[in-house]
Amino acid sequence: MTDETYMRRALELAEKGAGWVSPNPLVGAVIVKDEEIIGEGYHERYGQLHAERNALAHCTKSPKGATIYVTLEPCCHHGKQPPCTDALLAAGIRRVVIGSKDPNPLVHGKGIRILREHGVEVTEHVLEKECDAENEVFFHYMQTKLPFVILKYAMTLDGKIATYTGASRWVTGEAARAHVHRMRNRYRAIMVGVGTVLADDPMLTCRLKETENGANPVRIICDSKLRTPLESQIVRSAKEIPTILATCNRQEAMHMPYIEAGCKILVTPEKDGHVDLSDLMQQLGQLGIDSVILEGGGTLNWSALQAGIVQKVQAYVASKLFGGTEAKTPVEGQGFHTLSLIHISEP
């Protein structure tokens, strides 16, 4: 089998850590000796063994002289775990095949250099594009210290997210909704506007099948004037599921009922009557929140695009037609006045 074949297996393993290792990267590793896979591993939980050490621990025979395929450059510094380069050298690994170079300045090329200095053959850039995509959140956060924001919405064939009366359940079917819950498991936080809370009273939790493990995202409500009802499901469950209210309201007396209910309050400057989303992203990044699913209505979505905080758009299109000039669309507001302001890159 080829290097690409083994690296694809390492990518499959890396994916198993989705939702559990943030803010660490997703990493998978496969150890091969005499064209036989003798060990596999992935980074399973934040703070626990890295993929390389897990793969070494699961070897069915001595890894001395073997090749390890790892989706991300092995670390070479002491964090919650010791350097993986040390483990690979101690195990006698002969060759290391790497997908992505680690953007962490504590590593970035240093792990590769250490291995080569000790006589280990290193092959880089194998399925690099796929490995980079697997860790797009980690790469973005490591380079900017801002959350990676994905704008998600479901719409009809004629581009509507709700009827003119506001009815929106359900635009899409079960398959799309199941995919959304897998996204919620993968991303660190989910953000909506207060209008969504007032209209739908959602829980914004991760509901996966019993056979899957689901981690609830941090819930963020953009509520400039603090109109979120104290009796809403989100506020009532805030002591069990981390919940943030982002507001422009600086009156501490109005903050207290939410704080007592378990919510965290983040105050931003006001921008056009709304929460300053750029400032909010700075604060979320400082809290270690590396990724956000934006499930807002048309107004919040437009504000996010206008603020330039969105890195990716995920659209689900249903085979339905709502019609109506008053029906809600995914992006409202004034809109861009010229095509030259619109820049979209395809994956």
What residues fall within each predicted segment?
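Short beta-strand scaffold segments in enzyme catalytic cores
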Residues: V27-K33, Y153-A154
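Proteins enriched for Cys/Gly/acidic motifs involved in redox and nucleic-acid/cofactor modification
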Residues: W20-P23, Q48, I112, V126-A154
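Zn2+-dependent cytidine deaminase-like catalytic core
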Residues: I31-E130, V218, I244, N249-Q251, ...
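A short, flexible N-terminal coil/short beta segment enriched in small residues
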Residues: A10-A14, P23, D34-G41, E130-Q143, ...
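Structured loop/turn residues at beta-strand edges in well-structured enzyme cores
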Residues: K61-K64, A91, T144, N185, ...
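Enzymes that bind and transform nitrogen-containing heteroaromatic metabolites
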Residues: D3-R8, L13-G17, S22-N24, K80, ...
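A broad detector of short, well-ordered amphipathic alpha-helices
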Residues: R8, E12-E15, G39, H50-R53, ...
